[in-house]
Amino acid sequence: MNYLVMISFALLLMKGVESVRDAYIAKPENCVYECGITQDCNKLCTENGAESGYCQWGGKYGNACWCIKLPDSVPIRVPGKCQR
């Protein structure tokens, strides 16, 4: 029984776990992608591995793309200034 648990744990570690999060997708300089229509955001988000996306109007960063289930490997807007 212990062998089964250890093998399962080892397989989990070898495979790795890809987590996802809902967030504003960001440009390399920590700026959001501004938007006007949801279709543009949905395309941007899904091209970057998210499940979907939409244009969030009047949010914390103005009209910006919000992605749902965005992979950890894609940059998101973090607190701090946009470095344009």
From Swiss-Prot:
Superkingdom of origin: Eukaryota
Record domain LCN-type CS-alpha/beta: where: 21-83
InterPro entries: LCN-type_CS_alpha_beta_dom, Scorpion_toxin-like, Scorpion_toxin-like_sf, Scorpion_toxinL, Scorpion_toxinL/defensin
CDD domains: neurotoxins_LC_scorpion
Gene Ontology molecular function, alphabetical: potassium channel inhibitor activity; sodium channel inhibitor activity; toxin activity
Compartmental location: Secreted
Residue positions assigned to the propeptide: 84
Coiled-coil annotated residue ranges, if any: none
A Pfam family recorded for this sequence: Toxin_3
Signal sequence coordinates: 1-19
Gene Ontology biological-process entries: defense response; envenomation resulting in negative regulation of voltage-gated sodium channel activity in another organism
Family: Belongs to the long (4 C-C) scorpion toxin superfamily. Sodium channel inhibitor family. Alpha subfamily.
Name this protein carries in UniProt: Neurotoxin BmK-M10
Gene3D superfamilies: Knottin, scorpion toxin-like
Keywords linked to the UniProt accession: Disulfide bond, Ion channel impairing toxin, Neurotoxin, Secreted, Signal, Toxin, Voltage-gated sodium channel impairing toxin
Tissue: Expressed by the venom gland.
Disulfide cysteine pairs (residue numbers): C31-C82, C35-C55, C41-C65, C45-C67
